[in-house]
UniProtKB/Swiss-Prot annotation:
This is Pre-mRNA-splicing factor CWC24. One of its GO terms (cellular component) is U2-type spliceosomal complex. It comes from Saccharomyces cerevisiae (strain ATCC 204508 / S288c) (Baker's yeast). Keywords: DNA-binding, Metal-binding, mRNA processing, mRNA splicing, Nucleus, Phosphoprotein, Spliceosome, Zinc, Zinc-finger. A zinc finger (RING-type) spans 199-237. Present with 996 molecules/cell in log phase SD medium.
């Protein structure tokens, strides 16, 4: 504990005491400038009921303008490439934020180009990271055209192009032909169950087979001989009027069996 000493105060001590005043930190008050004090005084006058107009004098306006000019003198402006890029990025961010506020958030990504126009792109499909596929499209196979069409090339072995007469087909075309062959084979097998395996007139294999309107098959020569006797079918005795169609399906099946 400290005790106060009672000392006769002189005039010089009183002056020093005035200079060294205690500051109470519990009462936090902001120190106002002269201009703010003047404005606060004017506001207090207005609250008290005085009808004087609150206007800043020309001197105060001049002081404020001078201060603004002084601040402009000491502002630092750098026009480098780095600052330009930062400004561009800042403008882009502002445009993106404005666009997000205007439009509701969707699953689609929002992309902004340099002009600030909005472009919507579909969401990128997530692909597996452990698999990468590379596709090579050979639009110029370098095959000798003369040799492929005719089997002869004037350059002979010195020709720089490939001498090949193979026919290449795309995958979709091969699948289409495969499906067509399957359908044809199914149709043929269904019909063969009803078709006799030999001609009913000559009891031999079919030669240039024909089919009547009633669906019966005969050899072309056998059917012509039978039509001399009568125009009715030999099996079902229906009227054929002496006409018959070429059985192309049966002929294809017979050719496949021979081959």
């Amino acid at each position: 504990m400290f005790r106060k000493r009672l000392v006769n105060k002189s005039s010089s001590d009183e002056k020093n005491q005035k200079k060294r005043q205690k500051i109470n930190f519990s009462e936090e008050k902001l120190v106002a400038s002269d201009e703010e004090k003047g404005s606060s005084d004017l506001m207090s006058l207005a609250k008290s009921g005085n009808s004087r107009t609150l206007q800043l004098s020309h001197e105060n306006e001049g002081k404020l303008q001078k201060k603004g000019e002084d601040l402009d003198k000491y502002t630092l402006t750098v026009n480098d490439d780095s600052t330009k890029e930062d400004l561009l990025n800042f403008e882009r961010k502002e445009l993106a934020e404005k666009a997000k506020k205007r439009r509701p958030s969707d699953d689609n990504e929002l992309v902004l180009n340099m002009s600030g126009k909005n472009k919507r792109l579909t969401k990128q499909i997530n692909q597996p990271t452990n698999i990468r596929t590379t596709v090579l499209m050979d639009f110029q196979p370098d095959v000798c055209k003369d040799y492929k069409q005719t089997g002869y090339c004037g350059y002979g072995d010195s020709c720089k192009f490939l001498h090949s007469r193979d026919d290449f087909k795309t995958g979709w075309k091969l699948n289409q032909e495969w499906n067509a062959d399957k359908e044809d084979s199914k149709a043929v097998t269904l019909d063969l169950e009803k078709i006799p395996f030999k001609c009913t007139l000559c009891k031999e294999d079919y030669k240039s087979p024909v089919v009547t309107n009633c669906g019966h098959y005969f050899c072309g020569s056998c059917f012509a001989k039978d039509m001399k006797k009568g125009t009715k079918c030999f099996i079902c005795h229906k009227e054929t009027h002496g006409s018959a169609k070429v059985a192309s399906d049966l002929q294809k099946m017979l050719n496949k069996r021979k081959s």
